[in-house]
A protein has these predicted regions:
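Polytopic alpha-helical membrane-helix bundles and their juxtamembrane interface segments
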Residues: 1-220
Length: 220
């Protein structure tokens, strides 16, 4: 199994290469480099304790890799990419529910307002046939954010960054494109995925459980 330090070097090298590909408009290099950082996280988690939580986070990362590839291909595969990330959010949601089922009403209200507001902004600019897929995605990511906030710790931070990244995608694609969007989107996405993956490591998961008063991950 690759050492964590080697995986980190690989992820950072691929991330740098992808940023370069964005700046130079090199589609092939972008396609090859984009999924590598999340693949490195998948490999890294193989060394974490084999808990149900780790399993669901790993599944979510796997679907995220599929989404990365689909959205990097120079074709209109947005709906397929959306579906892949929808599955990723559902996997994360399942993992978070395995940690705690406490209602966390403030988190629920915040997540619902966030999802409704974002969907409202996007719909007001015309989603057309994408309205239903985007609405379903907004529902899934809002539920994922709610349960992540209920868990606290790195899970909450990662989910928040993931939602921010997806919000930037929606704004750039449907509302008002802006030059810095590709860079802000990918950086918040990678940081979010790193935080989510880190929450599945032994030390981070223990911290989450202590903060949330949840039951042991091992019993899920």
């Amino acid at each position: 199994m690759p050492r964590p330090s080697h995986l980190m070097i690989l992820a950072l090298a691929a991330a740098t290469l992808y940023i370069y590909a964005l700046a130079s408009d090199n589609t092939l290099v972008a396609l090859l480099a984009k999924p590598v950082p999340v693949l490195a996280l998948v490999a890294w988690l193989r060394g974490a304790p084999a808990t149900p939580y780790r399993k669901w986070i790993s599944i979510g990362l796997g679907f995220s890799v599929m989404g990365d590839i689909l959205l990097a291909i120079p074709a209109d595969l947005f709906v397929l990419g959306l579906a892949a990330f929808l599955c990723a959010h559902l996997a994360y949601l399942r993992g978070y529910c395995g940690i705690t089922l406490r209602p966390a009403l403030p988190a629920l209200i915040f997540s619902a307002i966030t999802g409704i507001a974002l969907l409202g902004v996007l719909a007001s600019h015309g989603l057309g046939p994408l309205l239903i897929p985007v609405a379903l995605y907004a529902l899934a990511i809002s539920a994922m954010l709610w349960r992540a906030l209920a868990c606290g710790g790195l899970a909450a931070i990662g989910a928040g960054l993931f939602v921010l990244s997806d919000s930037l995608i929606g704004i750039d694609r449907f509302v008002s494109p802006f030059a810095a969007a590709p860079y802000l989107i990918i950086l918040t996405y990678w940081l979010g995925q790193w935080a989510i993956a880190s929450s599945a490591s032994h030390r981070s998961t223990d911290k989450v459980l202590t903060q949330s008063g949840a039951r042991s991950v091992g019993s899920c």
